[in-house]
Structures are given as C-alpha cells and as structure tokens.
Regions:
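Hydrophobic faces of well-ordered beta-strands that scaffold small-molecule active sites
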Residues: 2-13, 38-42, 61-68, 94-96, ...
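Histidine-acidic metal/acid-base catalytic patches
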Residues: 1-13, 17-30, 144-161, 171-332
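Conserved, mostly hydrophobic/aromatic
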Residues: 31, 40, 56, 86, ...
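N-terminal capping/interface segment
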Residues: 1-39, 64, 71-78, 87, ...
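Acidic-and-aromatic substrate-binding clefts and catalytic sites of carbohydrate-active enzymes
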Residues: 14-21, 38-52, 69-78, 101-111, ...
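Active-site acidic/histidine proton-transfer and metal-coordination neighborhood
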Residues: 62, 71-165, 171-172
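Acidic (Asp/Glu)-rich catalytic clusters
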Residues: 1-3, 25-34, 46-65, 77-91, ...
Length: 332
C-alpha cells in the first residue's frame, strides 16, 4: 500500500476563462505556493517542452501524468509520440481519451480500442510511461459497460488493463434522462445491467474499483442531473452539458444555480470508496489523483468562481480523507 500522490491539471491553474492568459511560470508558481499538489498533469506541446522542463525543475513539481485525446485511424503515431514525451518527463501514466468515432466516421469497436491500447502499452512498457484509457463523455467509454468488455479482451491476451476514472461523467447522468439517452444507457439502466448511483449495490464505480482497473483518477465534482452550463455554447449552438459543480460555495453572482454542498455526497462517496479500497487492499492499483476543475464549454466556461481555488480546496479535502483513512486502517 503506497501513499497517493495528489496533483492538478495545468488546464485548471486559472481563476476564470475571462482572465488574461497566464505564463507557464505563473501557473507553476501558483500550484507550488498553494502547497496542495505533489505534481501537475499535462502533455506539453512540442514547442513548450523546454519551458515545462525548466518550470518542473524550478518549482519541484513533476509531470507525473500526461493527457491527450485521440481519433483512431488518425492519431496512432501521435499516441506513441506523447507516451515518449511523458517518459522524458518521468510521467508514470498517460491518460488517453479515445473519441467515440473512428476517423472513417464509424463508431469505434471494442477490438479497435483494445488494439490501440495494447500498441501503446507495448511501447509504454519499454520507455516507462503507461497508457490509461479514460472514462469520459464523447469517448467510446461513455457507453460505460464497454469498459469491462474491452478489459476482458485485453486481459485475455495477457495484458494488464488500466483506466483513468473520472466519475464526474457518471454522477452527472444520475436522474438525467437526456444524458442517459446517449448510447442508450437508459435501456441498460432499466434492464438492471447498469447502476449509476454509488449508494446502490453493484454500481458501476464500485465494480471498477474492485476490479483494480483504476490506476489514475481525475477529481472534478458533479451532482446528479448537474445544471447545464448556460453561459457557454459549442460551435453548433448547444449549451455546455454541465459536468462541473463547484466544490467551494460560490460568491453571489458567480454561479447561476443555488449551491448546495449536500448534493456533492454521491461524488464524494466514490472518492471515499476508492481511497478506502486503496488503504484496505494491498492489491490496489491506484497511484495518484489529479484535481481537474477546468474551463471548457461543458465545464467551467463563463463562470465567475475561481477554477484554481476549487482545485486547491478539493486537493486539500482529498489529502485530509486519505490521511484519515490511512490512520483508520493502520490502527485496525
């Protein structure tokens, strides 16, 4: 049982999306001065690699994980390139967000996802940076039951299966009929094949936790039927799906809904469950948790509350519960 590292997405080192862009040095300085983080998460663009290396060394904040999104049929070489960049920074993992549709426009198959992952894993094992497939909207894994299906395919070929869990993408779909129509998961729910609510026995998050698939985790709070982001639109005119709920009570005018911290209970329960599993189970695969309050359209675009402060306070809460949980299991 190892202590968990707690980090922050570089995309979340910003107060609001209306602020002037920050230099990378300023972002690293903010993260370091908060004393809340052990690392930061990012795959640097090629032209910024030297500046990232300088800031990592200056502020003693390593890049323990990279992240990128990929379209199969187009980005296989980019995937390997980003794993290589991660290895040069000492990143343990690289979070791969694989889009739901192939370059040819068809939905990606489980076999295609498995082959993509295995190719990255074979390369990553040689260079020291391992891929984790992320549970995420707009990706193949938004059809949540497919995660276990791909895992079985990968394991049957003798490979270890690793995921990045971002359970905000599960919690916001609870009591959310519109979101449950995507990939027809409402039918899986009605048939009893898929349980989203972490308070219910056999829920999908508990299944993934017990499987030890989860090696990396993203922490960004949401609530059931999370309010949509009415202050931001996609290019097609649709408003943000709403996959972020403030962890810290916003000041008046910073958020359009009445904030209720009690509604965070389901999201917090999953964090506590995975931390409990980690410190009670020597077989736990989890190594690190990245806070990921961010500003894109489906998340925090247009809001007045501080994205960075939510990352800091969430990280401090996670640190607190990990310390309490560790002591509980040591004393028992």
């Amino acid at each position: 049982m190892n202590d968990l590292f707690i980090g922050c997405s570089v995309f979340g080192i910003i107060h609001t999306d209306s602020d002037s862009p920050l230099t990378l040095e300023k972002q690293f300085s903010m993260a370091a001065e908060s004393e809340a983080f052990d690392y930061v998460e990012k795959t640097p663009p090629l032209e910024e690699i030297d500046e990232y290396k300088r800031c990592c060394e200056k502020f003693k904040l390593p890049l323990r994980c990279g992240i990128w999104f990929y379209t199969l049929g187009k980005d296989e070489d980019l995937f390997l390139q980003n794993l290589k960049i991660g290895s040069e920074f000492g990143s343990v993992y690289h979070t791969a967000q694989d889009m739901a549709h192939h370059e040819d426009g068809q939905l990606v198959t489980n076999e295609e996802i498995g082959n993509f992952y295995i190719a990255g894993l074979n390369y990553g094992e040689k260079i020291g940076c391992l891929p984790c497939l992320e549970v995420h909207v707009n990706m193949w894994s938004e059809d949540f039951l497919r995660v276990e299906q791909v895992a079985q395919m990968v394991q049957e070929q003798g490979y270890k299966f690793r995921i990045t869990l971002d359970h905000s993408h599960i919690i916001f779909k609870i009591d959310n009929p519109e979101e449950q129509k995507i990939f027809d998961i409402d039918k899986d729910i009605n048939d009893g094949k898929l349980i989203l609510d972490p308070y219910e026995e056999g829920n999908i998050c508990d299944q993934w936790i017990k499987s030890n698939f989860i090696h990396h985790m993203h922490a960004r709070s949401t609530i059931p039927n999370n309010p949509k982001n009415i202050h931001a639109q996609h290019p097609d005119g649709s408003i943000g799906r709403g996959i972020q709920y403030p962890f810290v009570k916003p000041l008046p005018g910073q958020y359009h809904e009445k904030w209720d911290g009690k509604l965070l209970d389901r999201w917090k329960l999953v964090v506590q469950s995975i931390v409990d599993h980690h410190y009670s189970n020597k077989g736990s695969s989890l190594e690190q948790i990245t806070t990921e309050f961010i500003t894109p359209t489906d998340y925090g675009a247009g809001w007045g509350y501080s994205i960075f402060n939510n990352n800091v306070q969430c990280a401090k809460w996670i640190r607190q519960i990990t310390n309490e949980t560790k002591l509980k299991f040591i004393n028992n």
